[in-house]
């Protein structure tokens, strides 16, 4: 409810959050707005970096790809060395724009796993990756998905195990829930 209140400028909620949590949600709002403004364009490095910069505003000084080695908590995978990040991101963007996939959910799972494995920024890679999920769905004329709090453990398990098929099925199930929810509000598909 608090995230909703901040994103939609709803002042009817009393917010009990730390300054960092507030910045995270406010920054997410601006990053999503930027992604929506660019929905008609193919994904570029500049867009991805701009999203990461926006997500980290007032939290961490991010101006581009990371310059140090990072490790992902709970994962066995070690992201590439900093000097390899740009090349990996070029490959990632090529996958997003040119690779043929079985369906949108397979594409989302594959590219999301690629992005999270690259871990291109010092901080907020998860939030940036989820903004990119929303961008990719909307860019391909699909409803966006939301990963509910009670489903986060499943989401992180798919990431940690690099389970592309499971993650694709997870995204598809979330999408189907969003469609059902939208239909309750009168949207027709």
Give residue ranges: language-model regions.
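FIC/Doc superfamily catalytic core
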Residues: 1-123, 127-189
